From Swiss-Prot:
Residues 1796-2004 form the Rap-GAP domain. Keywords: Coiled coil, Cytoplasm, Disease variant, GTPase activation, Nucleus, Phosphoprotein. One of its GO terms (cellular component) is cytoplasm. The lineage of its organism: Eukaryota, Metazoa, Chordata, Craniata, Vertebrata. Its main location: cytoplasm. This is Ral GTPase-activating protein subunit alpha-1. Residues 343-384, 476-497, 715-753, 849-910, 982-1009 are annotated as: Disordered. Pfam families: RALGAPB_N (PF20412), Rap_GAP (PF02145). The gene is RALGAPA1.
Amino acid sequence: MFSKKPHGDVKKSTQKVLDTKKDALTRLKHLRIVIENAESIDLKQFFDQHFSHIYYVFFENFVTIEASLKQKGHKSQREELDAILFIFEKILQLLPERIHQRWQFHSIGLILKKLLHTGNSLKIRREGVRLFLLWLQALQNNCSKEQLWMFSCLIPGFSAPQSEHGPRTLDNLINPPLNLQETQVTIEEITPLVPPQSGDKGQEDLTSYFLEALLKYIVIQVKSLEWKNKENQERGFSFLFSHFKKYYLPYIFPNICKENSLYHPILDIPQMRPKPHYVVIKKDAETNEAIYCTKEPFIKARVIVIRWLVSFWLEPKPHTGPHIPGMEGEVLPKNIQRAAASLVSREESKNDNADKTDRTTEPEQSHSNTSTLTEREPSSSSLCSIDEEHLTDIEIVRRVFSSKRSNVNFVTEIFRQAFLLPICEAAAMRKVVKVYQEWIQQEEKPLFMQEPEEIVITSSDLPCIENVTDHDISMEEGEKREEENGTNTADHVRNSSWAKNGSYQGALHNASEEATEQNIRAGTQAVLQVFIINSSNIFLLEPANEIKNLLDEHTDMCKRILNIYRYMVVQVSMDKKTWEQMLLVLLRVTESVLKMPSQAFLQFQGKKNMTLAGRLAGPLFQTLIVAWIKANLNVYISRELWDDLLSVLSSLTYWEELATEWSLTMETLTKVLARNLYSLDLSDLPLDKLSEQKQKKHKGKGVGHEFQKVSVDKSFSRGWSRDQPGQAPMRQRSATTTGSPGTEKARSIVRQKTVDIDDAQILPRSTRVRHFSQSEETGNEVFGALNEEQPLPRSSSTSDILEPFTVERAKVNKEDMSQKLPPLNSDIGGSSANVPDLMDEFIAERLRSGNASTMTRRGSSPGSLEIPKDLPDILNKQNQMRPIDDPGVPSEWTSPASAGSSDLISSDSHSDSFSAFQYDGRKFDNFGFGTDTGVTSSADVDSGSGHHQSAEEQEVASLTTLHIDSETSSLNQQAFSAEVATITGSESASPVHSPLGSRSQTPSPSTLNIDHMEQKDLQLDEKLHHSVLQTPDDLEISEFPSECCSVMAGGTLTGWHADVATVMWRRMLGILGDVNSIMDPEIHAQVFDYLCELWQNLAKIRDNLGISTDNLTSPSPPVLIPPLRILTPWLFKATMLTDKYKQGKLHAYKLICNTMKRRQDVSPNRDFLTHFYNIMHCGLLHIDQDIVNTIIKHCSPQFFSLGLPGATMLIMDFIVAAGRVASSAFLNAPRVEAQVLLGSLVCFPNLYCELPSLHPNIPDVAVSQFTDVKELIIKTVLSSARDEPSGPARCVALCSLGIWICEELVHESHHPQIKEALNVICVSLKFTNKTVAHVACNMLHMLVHYVPRLQIYQPDSPLKIIQILIATITHLLPSTEASSYEMDKRLVVSLLLCLLDWIMALPLKTLLQPFHATGAESDKTEKSVLNCIYKVLHGCVYGAQCFSNPRYFPMSLSDLASVDYDPFMHLESLKEPEPLHSPDSERSSKLQPVTEVKTQMQHGLISIAARTVITHLVNHLGHYPMSGGPAMLTSQVCENHDNHYSESTELSPELFESPNIQFFVLNNTTLVSCIQIRSEENMPGGGLSAGLASANSNVRIIVRDLSGKYSWDSAILYGPPPVSGLSEPTSFMLSLSHQEKPEEPPTSNECLEDITVKDGLSLQFKRFRETVPTWDTIRDEEDVLDELLQYLGVTSPECLQRTGISLNIPAPQPVCISEKQENDVINAILKQHTEEKEFVEKHFNDLNMKAVEQDEPIPQKPQSAFYYCRLLLSILGMNSWDKRRSFHLLKKNEKLLRELRNLDSRQCRETHKIAVFYVAEGQEDKHSILTNTGGSQAYEDFVAGLGWEVNLTNHCGFMGGLQKNKSTGLTTPYFATSTVEVIFHVSTRMPSDSDDSLTKKLRHLGNDEVHIVWSEHTRDYRRGIIPTEFGDVLIVIYPMKNHMFSIQIMKKPEVPFFGPLFDGAIVNGKVLPIMVRATAINASRALKSLIPLYQNFYEERARYLQTIVQHHLEPTTFEDFAAQVFSPAPYHHLPSDADH
């Protein structure tokens, strides 16, 4: 019989137990052996068979022990009692069926009474309670009333119920007080078995002690009864539990509410509860913190029950017992411990574990969300496979709780009671919160949370479904199956035996009620609703702010609840009712917690952390707002709720946290708006990534590929910004689309894709997928974005869905694994220290949830519109439907193009709030989302339905149009025209195609929502139908339900869509009410500061719309644009506030200026501008300088360049305001901006002679005509140029002066202040700040181009400027030489080069005019200006010490003082510290190890520049430009040209073998090559020899020096061939050789006479004599010598001994000779003359006086090939001893040739290449810009003004990389002076007919560092359009409507300031080309100054010359030198034709 036989004598023991002869003790011993060694099945059988024997043995022994205990009571007896009770327990456990039949009823009852006696020790009493409960469990309904009464008295401390015998206590029940008479039989009095011992521990709180025991034993003994029918175990628990509820609960929970039901929940929001009275009960032993309690009765009991109930739903590990609080460390009786095989011991160990675990884990968390605790509810996964045998106690208990509605309601109600506990019991509340959290978060819900079903599935249906898990089944099916799986246990229970047990209270229900009672599925939504309501009680308890511990606990609890709310908001699918419940509760909670009187609020200011409100403000606002947004994405939220939100939030604006959260929300909503309406990702904008985009390009159909790389912002507060891809939109949609096979097919397609994509997200749970969305990538990039290249269609709704998924799936799976959201339960239950992390978790969702609906359709729904049947008529009548006075509204959301095409003006100033969303019917077709009209709209259809609406439905209030300037929360409702059509196709209703041919996003019409419609039978126009329903090629028409629109528009599509995003953005923007009503100035300022940021984002969106993504085509203008002026009503109103709100006002002014200085897509209307100008007028004249500063700062520089209608009305205000800024003492004022504004106005007065403008001295609006605007501007600019303390501002002022001077000179206004302006510029040349001085120098440099006009204005001005430059250099030189700063030296160099240009611009005649110094010490000698020039240059070369010698001193500044010029005008010094120069060169600071080079360079900077100027003047003054034209500065001739000894085309070593060439060095600075070449014959006019007799060879001298290369040909002249007789004296004539024909007439400013070519010699001179005066041309009265001397003086003025005085005028007598001495000399000469005469007369005929007659010599041909060269050198004195030191030979080697070639390749002028682009209207990409072949007339005129056209094929000047082979064009503009060459790479001049030529063109243009862009496009030009690493400076020219030109300069930050044009300048067309050219040249110079070790052309040339001289000079003796000069190389014969 017994299978387990470790004990050899089990059988024997069995027999001995049954042996009646044995004594009771022996039988007991053997009974124990049997119990301990038998299997439980065998044991049960044994007990069943021999129950009588067993009970007898037990009872006998019990009686014995009882007697001995009363006698002795030793410990041994107590242990024996334990052993006996062990047997007793086994009897109760193994014989439940018999006991149920009341077997041994009284005997057992008596024993239990003895154990329960209140006189026993606590341990025995507790053991009695345990056994009593076992007995009751077996008896169940067969017990008597007495047992139930005893049960009701088991726990002391509860008030005893009354009976006829007095109060019914336990003592009374054990020993009833019977009123017996003495004669009657009395019952034996029951006495205690084991009274308390002296060492026993007492219990303070017996109620808690026994309550905990009772609750513990009710549960852990459920399974210990070995019933044959296992269902009796559940019944036993149910029986005890129902009586516990009956007898104890009314006391423990006096306010328990029976009506509360999960099935018919009462969802009224609770009221605020007052703060309980907390008292300290003790201090914590460890932390010493006070522990508080409230003195409520039974509060502890309440906590115990709650914790007990919680323990069934929270288990630390699977299969462990529940934690029963208070049982820690308890030791159970030894018999239980010993019975290893028994169930009891198992349970004991379980309890110990549970206790330990719970104690340790309460502060921490089970970090697993996959715990099986709650998975063991009845469900297919567990119960189909688990036998009833193996159910744990807890599972049984849970089954009971889940068996019928009343029990479920009980659990719910107790949990509600938990939320009503005082905060000192937070630990219990935490556990309840944890339970709810697990229920909400875990996959498998408790049965009552599963969805109710109508169909009952019998148990026989279950097996086939049991383990189905198929991820590919559709969402709905999957969910249904899940629910089916969950039902089988319930059905099992129901079908087998629940019906029998009906009710344990004895009330029998009829069948239908019972069925209802047992159908416990309430569904998740009901549980969520009840939880939301009940948990709100925690918030609605008045906080104990004064007790820190309790405040911490309260905060912690609130945050835990909020965390669950947040989880629900983000992750849980909720229905409309639940959402509304959530929002209502959050609203009330927010209001109740945070609303407080202002006094109370101020009291806690700065101590917010000491109040619950202060701590919760941020989390509450965040949760409320995010929940609100998520709700609107999922269900339709009524207008009333929105109104509530508005009223609550607008009343809480004194919370800074609200402003912060609102700003964060708006930031995210703006991103969402960008994504869904404009298809832009703000974190990855096209403009930010145009360079990388080319590689990333998708080739797919319209896929918005811009959103591929997206960072995931893990924050809850942004979590709503992306749709949840899986939020079962299809399921919601199916309500309207069931039945259509196409629908089902489409739905399954979408679902599969959705599941595939999202499977990997968050946690690996198949069914959760639809509630999650973590990925930034999912929805949006696939659906939300339109391809950047295509115009934004009027609706972005589409059904084009399959394509993107294949691309996205792999990526999403990969990336999202790393973004899984950790389960939110991980922190709950932890101490409040963990809560911040939780909040982060919660916040972790804020940016993450992706497009739910997007997963179903790309950006669906703006097209989801409802269309009235009379649509076509409405379209036709559009123009007639507008009321006369309606301003009409193409708002900023419309396309600029379409707005422009109508005569309407924007609604910015519309009386009802300047709503930028307004539309009248006329414009709906341009609007992406329906009737968000500024007039009316219904929240149901906010964005999608243009149907007729009743008055109640005019949902404008606070939601769509905001009426942001209205004080009230609701907005005015206006009449709404019934004829409104919201159309989504194009106006012709034809499909819209993108330029790339990809499928356009076409809209679909929405569900026609009958509730809101009067016309139900709508027919779509056929054509419209096609456009609206256009579907992609790969889906049939039927595959997508076409009637869907967003829930917000009354449809079924959830998630973000264009209309939803728009409406949500609008509503949230205005959710604070009128922001100008915010009382706290700081918060007001904070809000306005954020509005600035918000506007920036909108502006960014606008800038990124219509951007070419491939840079090959320009997209058409966007149809929808952001409402940049939407904020203006708030801003306008803010400017009217008091000074208390100053900071906010400043932000408002700033934003007004920023808004209005942008290019306006939609021109503002008259009313708006009137309001705007009024505000600006008041602001500019405001007494508060900060306001003036703000306006000036943010209006500059573009304000006047926009050409706003009537903007010139503000000119006077701006001049006055800018003047105020300039004259203020504050350095941080917007000084530069003020100067830029003033500078932009200098050209206006000449355009507008009389300017109507607001009067700046009157605050009222009064328009006056101003004629003195010019005077006012120039007065302000002049004073700024003198006194401005800020360096950059002073520079701008000087530039403005320069521009103004040019403007006045061009208009020939002869303005008197030009002199003063020139004076200021000239005085600034010596300003201490070198940057300012440099700018002044640049201005003078620019004026060189206006010399002729200056001479007209004031003839002596140019000469005066040269004198000023000379005097300034003289003044600066000594200090500069001593300075170690390179900037100082660079300034003098700039002045020298400026001086050179001025000298070259004036005719020689002017320069030679005598200069009369005004200085007192001046000697009486006259000197010419040229003389002074050379003196100052000499000083610069040899050092300022030269000036100490009066002979070498040029002139001082004081010499120049005059009425017009004050050289010592006072200039205020700058207040800002100068940038610290290091003595090192700025240009070379990047390369440290080059100090020596730098110092050398620095020391020589001025000297080299001065030498260059000198050589330049010597070579070019009076000669440039020569016949070759300005492009030719230096000779192109080389040593090999015309050389018969050299056959090579370039310099080659054979030259060294030539006998006719020699190379010399002169003065160590100049290279001279002498070559003897053949003379040319038969030249017209005689060629070089001018027809005179000459030798057959000429001498060519090629000179290379600092300023270039020059070639001189010389011939020896013998005389005229016809004349014989005396030979003519030998003479040489030098001339320039080989000049080419001029390409262009020379453009020198000198007025030259005709060029006379005489005998082939080109001469330019001022006509004085026709020819050289010869004997045959002289008239009789003329003196030949006189004429010759005059001729020489004119043609060679350098020969004049005295400036300006002809050579034939006798010189005055020397000063040192007196008249007497003069007479003596004359007499001596006359005497000598007389004596000589007499001698001749006397000896004339002497033979000795007569000479032999000479014959003419016979000519000899020289034999040497170098003869004439050495003859010339000899004549020039080069062979003399005194020249020996300065004249040397060069070594002849290949290196020399290489150096010479290199030297010749260097430029001899400064060169610049500058790109010029033409941008036509609408061009935004490089391709269309580069393919322009011409431009507008204004552009062509401008290009013509930059220079003159040169033919590239024969251009001999600087080419700038252009080719002569016509591949880079035929002609190009070119400009040159003798010092500068500029070539313009004009894009319209270069060919663009092939890809190759385009590439070449881009290469040329792109490599230029300065770009000039002429833009006629409506948008500002962007740097990135022409992709290049160069283009460091962009000078962009925008033609304005008033024929002026606005200049925008974009430069890299490191580029130093340059002028004359500055960013924001506005100039006249007449000065534009010269100004732009000068600016481009200065920009190019500024860029070159940044290059480390950069050298100017002359520095480079000087270095090359120096290198050649150093390395190739050959020192020789005189003999060797003479030999080399005599014969450069040995030769054997002359060339064959040498003797011609």
